[in-house]
């Protein structure tokens, strides 16, 4: 495992270099990947997707290529770039995918020779279910408007004895900041420009998914949450909450569509030897993007180089705790990594 000093040196020495490079849209426009010329490029907050009618596997399954970036977003605002974030989350996702793919399914194709650190993900182009599937085991303190914590604070301020959250009737006095919930709660939210937490009944009534689809999604997610929780407990950590996205594949199966149990989509807290949550300055010792959210002081703030490097160190340290393995960075220029990985995928699948 890399020591704290080694991680700091890695980020300090290579941070600027690994953030350099073109977007996939620019690479395609420069005709660096001829097979993708004319394809649709969807640019997201932190990653981009590429697909087209002609981009299919040899047996006709539509392909979507997802390109992870180093961009970071909090409170629905882009805050800059974090060195190595793309590679860290790629390895984080790969590790978790191997734990839960038999339970949640996966849209990803396996490509021989593609490294776990590859920031290009080959996947089936699913019919997406327009819902963010959020599971919560603890009420983590959070500044995010859709969080259970913010809804609980509002209920307390209004003097309510109970409140409704995503279809759950909750006793205000039964909860405490960063405390464990009475049970694992499914708390879906919409996939809008500004997300909002909703009752599962809303999804069914508005045709987002069928009752059967939601039941499958909920049951599989509860099982996967348990699998990951058991793995982490053996490493002295606890899974606090997670957000996953799903879609329907060509075989009419509901499968995971995006990253699974990463530090961007989940919260992980460290445990003491007696199994209680470890605290520092009265707060849980956490491995998640919440650390970056806590650094935001105003709505339009951009992270400085020093802040970005500090966040990068936390990401790498978190990965090593989650996987129990040393972080192995790919130090090739970013453009080279993207082009070579994409060509390998296209040669293998199409």
Task: Label each PLM-derived region with a short phrase.
Residues 273-321:
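C-lobe/activation-segment region of protein kinase-like
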Residues 178-211:
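A short mid-domain helix/strand-loop element embedded in enzyme catalytic domains
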Residues 240, 244-293:
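Catalytic activation segment of kinase domains across protein kinase-like and atypical kinase folds
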Residues 112-119, 232-249:
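A short glycine-rich, hydrophobically flanked beta-strand micro-motif that places a catalytic Asp/Glu
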Residues 209-240:
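A long amphipathic alpha-helix within ATP-dependent nucleotide-binding catalytic cores
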Residues 25-189, 300-350:
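Active-site loop/lid in soluble adenylation, ligation, and acyl-transfer enzymes
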Residues 3-41:
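Short, Gly/Pro- and small/polar-rich lid/capping loops
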